[in-house]
Amino acid sequence: MKVLTLLEKLGRGNQPNVQVQIFATISSETVDNDYQNIKQSVHKIIVEQMTPTEQMVLSAVQQEAAEVEQVIGNYVDKVLEDNPFAVPVSERGRIVSDLRDEMLGLGPIESLLKDPSITEIMVNGPKKVFIERMGKLQLSGVQFHDDAHVMNIIERILSPIGRHIDESTPLVDARLKDGSRVNIIIPPLALCGPCITIRKFAQKALSVENLISFGTLDRKMADFIKACIQARINILVSGGTGSGKTTTLNVLSSFIPENERIVTIEDAAELKLQQTHVVTLESRPANIEGSGQITIRDLVKNALRMRPDRIIVGEVRSGEALDMLQAMNTGHDGSLTTAHANTPRDALSRLETMVLMAGFEMPVRAIREQISSAIELILQQSRLKDGSRKITYITEVQHMEGDVITTQDLFRFEQTGMDADGKLTGHFVSTGMQPGFMEKFQTNGVELPEDFFMPDEEAGGRYY
């Protein structure tokens, strides 16, 4: 959206003049009203009085932040000169910063996007903006003016990527320039007003060392997972919403050899692979006429024609699970994907359901045979009560016994309690079971110590 259009929208409903009453006192609400009045006055003056040169600065496709701040600052100074006691002088920088964010960024939530400690932003209407920090949800002090203000920011998110939202299509998924995932839903579906959910995209890809330091897994588990990737084991990362599946998938991909051709498929591109030979594919929703949709399933089918060494699907949700399983069963070993499930056993059941959504009449046993021959390992990722994220199970998918897929846990997290700070305590343990796919380790030249799968106590203490 053009800056001038944004300014005009934000400036509507202002008082007919730019005079700001001086309040003697009193409450924080009154002070905030004065601040908002001054800010709206600056909006109004910029729209009405800007020179052609200033208009060029504010309307440029590529705005220079310093020039925009200078233009805004001049008008802020003009208003404060006429009303020196309206707000403290110290608020001058805040006004300039807020107006700059309205013009160059996403308004009130721009500062939250810049905060590296915040991982998720949830706008529930204009007056409630929640954030996730260090795994915990909290109400931020950020607010929008009203529903129209939220809608202006939504338009700012969607316009650059050609997406559209209105009452006839009141929900949309999008992506910010930095790759952060955005979901938007508006009235009449959202009764509290326009809602925005932003899953921030990590600017720097995490390494396995980061996950070890976070307590997501231990060194022995990391060594085993690395060996599995190098031995071309097909892996499913299972977990609930916000459990860290995509982050873990990113780390797993870092173990793939540099000389392999990798095709990634996602709804919204989040993976940050470090290898050179990577092809990134992204699905596309239908346009406003209802045509032009390209699904994950379409992309999986196409990826098979692209001579991939490995296929990575960001998440399977529907019928594409069948195509992914067939890819794993037809020479694309070492492929990776994620799915929403709370336990390894639930993940297998979810895969069954998703295969049925492909629209083919298949016996349940045939589906389970496909799953058991394709998926070899499940990493169960969980978000625990204290906000921490851990790989709680590493489970081998074995074979069919009758009509049941058999599994065995290789590693698991054992919780022992909670400390005085409310942090869960526990440790990772090896169950002592050896996976049945060790032959693939030998075939691919991957070696592990002979006592690697011994229970931790027998192997001479815990392996960290």
Feature-to-residue mapping (PLM):
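N-terminal anchoring/assembly modules that precede and organize ATP-driven motor systems
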Residues: 1-138
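Switch/coupling sub-region of P-loop NTPases
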Residues: 222, 226, 231-238, 247, ...
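P-loop NTP-binding catalytic core
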Residues: 115, 123, 128-231
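Conserved glycine(s) of the Walker
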Residues: 244
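AAA+ ATPase "lid" subdomain C-terminal helix
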Residues: 183, 377-387, 400
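NTP-binding/hydrolysis catalytic cores, primarily Walker-type P-loop NTPases
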Residues: 387-464
